[in-house]
Regions:
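Glycine-rich repeat segments that build the extracellular carbohydrate-interaction surface of secreted
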Residues: 107-111, 128-150, 155-164, 214
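N-terminal secretory signal peptides that target proteins for export/translocation
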Residues: 1-6, 41-43
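Right-handed parallel beta-helix/beta-solenoid
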Residues: 31, 35-45, 59-60, 65-131
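Surface-exposed loop/turn motifs in large extracellular/passenger domains
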Residues: 139, 150-157, 172-190, 201-224, ...
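Sec-dependent N-terminal signal peptides of Gram-positive bacterial secreted proteins and lipoproteins
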Residues: 7-28
Length: 492
């Protein structure tokens, strides 16, 4: 009789116990030719859905699975054959093939009172340094009992950082050096599975010598009630991959994913999603430079600026990536106040974002489905602004309609230039400006320059399917529209 046997010689004098282990690895119409312009005469009282300019009253603003290779027939020698399945198998001598799972280590790190001579196996035997904790963890969990300061170049890989207690000031404080996180998980779950309350930001990057790079496989968040990362004082955060996650349930005031002040944020890949904030669901920027070259900012919500909220002389540059499926009251994709926006990337997309007036038009203005600007400038040379929506509220008792302004862009007291091969298409508004709504006043002028691009397939339930321009108070010359190129067609 012949049975299967292993290639390698096995000593049958010994009872054999085989243990299979598994490693766990942790895991942002009408065509206008050059020189032409369609402007409605106020005296004639005519209006065209493609472009309208009028005066109006003021409006409310495992490791791989190990299998044992079995082959070759051999003579029966009284040995009992066994399989490579992960189960107990009997031998003729009564020994057992056992399958076992080895759990990864959990290490406690206390930067204040820990000692690297300790085992790190409990809070009372915590180690002191990050390097020792990483060494002992071997890809497992590191429970932080205090905020860890990083002030030198370091690359962290294949571990999970969790709070070791229910109240902490923060988790990582990066004051200098280049810090890279690869296949890192940082979350809010304490050893007993509850959430930690932070008095400061979970991750803080500060100072001009500090750079945090988030690479593939990294997951940061959620941190309910906190921004995930603050970057300040001329420091830099690079999101090259991974995820910065929110839970959509707990609202922070500023910047659910990243809060940037006097800093630089480069998004080259990865995802920022699921955040809820009053201002800036994905990214909040004040006096900062935000550069989006790739990645995705999606499924965030806020009152203003669900994707990006930029104020105070911030510069926002979009050369790639997607800002998609965000929901807000104003500027669901991008919101700018006293700031500048540059869009110049064929692959850049601002799409399927929605502004609404719910639950209250007082806060949720329903303006700028893709982009909202106030006292700001935008230069759009390429990219696509597509399928964004500005929803209007139902008319009040006096018949006035709130919101529904600018399906793609709403610009107040701002300067907007559209040129190149920009595509603004298939956007919709519930009141005015299916594609673009722009407004000036007696004291605050607005300027819309259309030098190129295509505005097509946009829809409005009210006026100005392509463009609606208005001077809401005073001198109508404070609202200028210059069309010297491009195509405006099939808007309805």
């Amino acid at each position: 009789m012949k049975k299967k046997c292993f290639k390698k010689t096995v000593s049958w004098a010994l009872s054999i116990v085989m243990s299979a282990t598994m490693a766990v690895t942790p895991v942002l119409a009408d065509t206008f030719t050059d020189g032409s312009q369609l402007i409605v005469s106020e005296d004639a009282g005519e209006e065209t859905p493609a472009a309208a300019i009028s005066d109006a009253e003021d409006e409310g603003m495992m490791e791989p699975e190990h299998t044992f290779e079995i082959e070759d027939n051999c003579e029966d020698s009284g040995r009992t054959g066994f399989s490579s399945e992960n189960e107990a198998s009997g031998f003729s001598d009564g020994s057992v093939l056992a399958a076992q799972t080895e759990e990864k280590a959990a290490v406690y790190l206390d930067p204040s009172s820990g000692n690297d001579d300790n085992t790190g196996k409990s809070a009372t035997s915590a180690v002191k340094t990050l390097s020792k904790a990483v060494e002992l963890a071997q890809g497992g969990d590191i429970f932080l009992l205090g905020r860890v300061e990083v002030d030198s170049d370091i690359k962290l890989s294949n571990v999970t950082f969790r709070p070791g207690k229910s109240n902490m000031s923060g988790m990582l404080y990066i004051s200098r050096g280049k810090v890279t996180l690869e296949n890192i998980i940082i979350n809010n779950k304490t050893p007993d599975g509850k959430s930690c309350q932070f008095s400061n930001y979970p991750i803080e990057v500060t100072g001009r010598l500090a750079t945090l790079t988030i690479a593939d496989g990294t997951e940061i968040g959620p941190f309910p009630g906190n921004s995930c990362i603050i970057v300040s004082h001329d420091s830099t955060v690079n999101l090259n991959g991974g995820k910065i996650l929110g839970d959509k349930q707990n609202t922070v005031e500023y910047g659910g994913g990243i809060y940037a002040e006097h800093a630089t944020v480069n998004v080259n890949g990865g995802t920022i999603s699921g955040h809820s904030a009053t201002y800036g669901g994905g990214i909040f920027s004040s006096y900062s430079n935000i550069k989006i070259n790739g990645g995705t900012i999606s499924d965030n919500q806020s009152i203003r600026g669900s994707g990006i909220y930029a104020i105070n002389d911030s510069n926002v540059s979009l050369k790639g990536g997607s800002i998609i499926h965000n929901k807000s009251g104003q500027g669901a994709g991008v919101y700018l106040s006293i700031s500048k926006l540059f869009i110049n990337g064929e692959s850049c997309q601002i799409t399927q974002n929605t502004v609404t007036t719910e639950p209250s038009p007082k806060d949720m203005r329903g303006e700028g489905g893709g982009i909202y600007l106030i006292y700001s400038e935008a230069e759009i040379e390429s990219g696509t602004i597509n399928k964004n929506t500005a929803i209007a509220a139902a008319p009040d008792e006096n018949g006035n309609i709130q919101g529904g302004l600018g399906g793609a862009i709403s610009a107040k007291y701002s300067r907007v230039t559209i040129k190149g091969d920009t595509k603004i298409r298939n956007n919709s508004a519930g009141n005015r400006g299916g594609a673009i709504y722009t407004e000036g006043t007696n004291n605050d002028s607005s300027l819309l320059n259309i030098e190129g691009g295509t505005i097509s397939g946009n829809h409005v339930n009210g006026s100005g399917a392509g463009i609606f321009a208005i001077c809401s108070r005073g001198n109508k010359h404070n609202m200028d529209v210059n069309i010297s190129g491009g195509t405006i067609t099939n808007n309805y």
